[in-house]
Amino acid sequence: MLQRIREVVSLANNPATDAVTKKQALDYLEQMKSDPNAIQIFCSMLTDSGSDDLCIFVSLQILCDLVAMNTSVDLLFVKNSIVEFLRGKINRNIKDAEFLRNKISELITRLFINMYGEVNGNQWNTFYKDLIALLSIDSLLTGPSEHFSPLGLDYFARICIQINSEVADQTFLRSKDEQTKNNNLKDTMRLEDVQTLVTIWFNCLKSLIIQQQNFELAVIILSCIGAFISWVDITLIVNPEYINIIYGYLDYSDTKIACSQCLCEIISKKMKPVDKLTLLSMLNLTDKVASIGEDDIDVYEKLAKLASSVGLELSIILEQCNEGVQSNETLEVANAADQQVLNQVAPLVLKFMSHEYDSVTEQCFPFISQYLAILKKLFAIGGKPGTAVAINSKRQPLDEAHQNFLVSLLNVCFEKMKIDDSSESNSEEAIEEFNDIVRSKLKVFQDSIAVINPNIYLENISNHIQVSLAGTDWTVLELAIFQMHNLCESIRNNLFGLNKTEISTSAATQLMHKFMALLLQNSNLFQMDNRYVQILFFELVVRHYTFLGSDTKDAVSLLNIFCSEFGMFNKSEKVILRTWYLFTRFVKISKPHLSVSVLSQLVSKVMPLLVIKTVTPSVDGSEDCDTTFDSQLYIFEGVGMLIGANADNTYDILDQVLTPLFTDLERCISLQSQSPSIVLQSHHILMAIGTLARGTHMGLVPENQVNNALVNEKLIHRTLIEKFSNIAEVVLVTFSYFNKHETIRDASRFTFARLIPILNGGIVTFASKLVVLFLESDLKTMEMNDFLGFLGQMVHTFHGDENFYDLFDNLLTPVINKLHILLDHLESESNESNWYGEQNGRENNGNDVSGARTSKTVVVTDSYRDKILLKKAYYGFLQSFVTNNVTSLLLSNRNRSILPTILGDLLSYNPQEIQETSTMKLALNVLVNFIKFFGSGGCTDVNDVHASSIGKLDGLNEYFITRTIPLAFEIPFKPQYKFNINDGSCRVIACDLSRVLKEMYIQSGGGQDVNSNPALKYLTEVYFPQIQLPSELGMELIQMLITQDTKAFEKYYVTLINRLTS
């Protein structure tokens, strides 16, 4: 048996073993746990001469798993086995690999958890006594000693740490029962054994200092002390003799880190403020830390953390003493803590904070954050009026000591905010990390100081910016711009606590105007070839352009800077792409009204960037092949906005941009080639033209009025309409030539959508040709979705235009027919996919669990999903007729023949479609509105200007009655629809179905006389008898339909479904 286990362990651990065999090996070991003799077998493995380290490790792991689920007899067997196993190791001084020592310690810890204390029936109450004797460390009970086993002490410390992890570590979530058990174990340890543990640790540390060796043992003992301190009596450890011994290990390079961590844990122990202050005063850690000389970075990190921890604890004392009602004692404690921070801790922490390594700096952040938070509560005179910090501040006068601290902290922030001089262009990740972790936190500290005392902040940061702006090194100038951004944000967020009316004339605002002017005049800056400086400059002036002043000259100066090698013509791709976007962003938010002469010069400068150069898509279809073009579109939009907003209302300059595009487009068409590169070039040109049109429109019309036809008609000049009519013609010619290509169809639709608000009613002529071209094209599903959305937008924009009405009257039937060709194709594909799925399901039945199909399984293929999306777009298109009061189009002479098809789409659903709640809700909403507006047979929409000219359709009311009423009863009750009224999505559908019934009743004449209302008559005389609904229930439903309003009937209908299906 043992040999078999060894073979299985070897197989499971062999990298060459195949996955199937490895799984079988692991399954075998898992099954062995269920063997009645598993405990005995794996205990035997520990001492079997044929077991290697791996077999022993696996055996120990399995025994760990078994300990928690076995009887006291088995536990005793495991205890005796592991004790003898470990005794042999100690007696022969066999120091196994660390992973084995940890696993042995884990097994002993598991035995402790299940055998120690009253909670475990006192099965092993002499645990620590036995362990100390077993590990040959009992000499440490009486004092320092040389006569103990270092290996035994190593095991003892590891076991202590693992026991603490199990019973006291708050990192892991435990059940209430587990937590109760752990608390009982800790209580027993406090009463019986903690004093012994503390004594052994103390004598061990004392012995190792005397011996000046085995410092690796000191490290693990210090870890023990740090782990246990949170829940043992602190006086056992915090006394002068014990602390002095711990302190001593700060003097040794091998133990500095562990000692620092241990001291951090000690001072973090929860206690009353006065007791904590006494502890910190006794420890006097800052003097000790300050006396330590140069060391490696890891040690510095821990020492910085230790100094910060002292400051953090003092800050907590200060906060606690300032809460609630203060006594003389609390005031004295608070003052003593504050003085200790200012005189001892702060200088040391600020020294660590200014260290060249950011990892050391970061250790200081918790203390600085906590202390500044307290200072805000005590001294803050800033902060946005009405915010918590402004309301809750005690506004005490800021004394000189605290002023000095704030100034010193600001100076450290200024120093540490500068990017490392050694940073090269390839260190982008390091700089981003620096910005995210260090700079962002330092900015928060600066902001806190601004809130505490705006004058200190403003005086120091303004001097800092002034000096930095005169620098020639890129890191200094970059920092100056960064700090200008911070100052702008301080003003924007009103950290200075000013009234709104005072902000624009405040000293801070005046300073920013001055700094912005200096920045634009800084010749060193614009000669600097550094992408961090360049991008940060443009980010600053765009985000905070209001500080540039209202003079158009500033805007022109900045636009010229954009159009230089410093900006949009930069050699760095990252700068180029970012500035192209920021250029347009700046134009959009500032909307400068430039004269045509100035504008012409700017456009001439930008023209090289408006040349479209395509990159042929790679064979693998990568989307990264032409990423530049998307950013290039921003320039077209920005140029369009400048032209649209020009001060002279002259738009001939548009030709300067459009003519090259038209020429290039003519070239593409004249080549008589439809190669991928030519098609892509044509697509890009169309997109550029559409984007230019959008920009021009945005420059002319206020952003919130771009879709207002009256405003557009008033503001858009006749010459512009002629130019954009010409654009529409160009788009149609291009579309006609390249209509087989989806990208061209997309670009054409995009451009036309941008022309609609500009040309208004003038677009109709062009739109009719565009729609015909689309209908003649081989559209894909997603294209049809977008096309229907485009048509819906046109319905919304031009529903009051007579020409539009005629256009849609002519095109509605062809559009629906085109739509049905696509729907039929998708239906065929979906059915075919389902057939293959069923065949595969039969073949896999019984062999593959994933082949099982329940009665509720919905097979979702790509074709099915496309069909659902297309129907959703279709219903949205139909809804646009309702929303814009043109449902009469559906009843016109031209479209009456297609109406049954449309209504059939709204009245026929398969079980899969019922599960698509959002689509069903939209469809039923359209159906309800159709019933509302022409359910009686004639168009009754009072807002539809063509309603009176549409004759009544005979039989339409009867059609609605005979088709909608069954729908309202079949969907909830027919088994194939799997309708569950308790499901939220089904309940939504039920509510919509109730509205269908209610609206059908109203449009059939309403009233209380069943015989005079065709809908009620059909229900009582035809449908209810047909479905064999009890007459009492039928009359109840009729009565509710007559007497209840829509909301009340909806509630009744849902309740009825519940009653009939429960």
Swiss-Prot record:
Its main location: nucleus. Keywords: Cytoplasm, Nucleus, RNA-binding, Transport, tRNA processing, tRNA-binding. SUPFAM superfamilies: ARM repeat. The keyword Transport applies. InterPro entries: ARM-like, ARM-type_fold, Exportin-1/Importin-b-like, Exportin-T_C, XPOT. PANTHER family: EXPORTIN-T, EXPORTIN-T/LOS1. This is Exportin-T. It comes from Vanderwaltozyma polyspora (strain ATCC 22028 / DSM 70294 / BCRC 21397 / CBS 2163 / NBRC 10782 / NRRL Y-8283 / UCD 57-17).
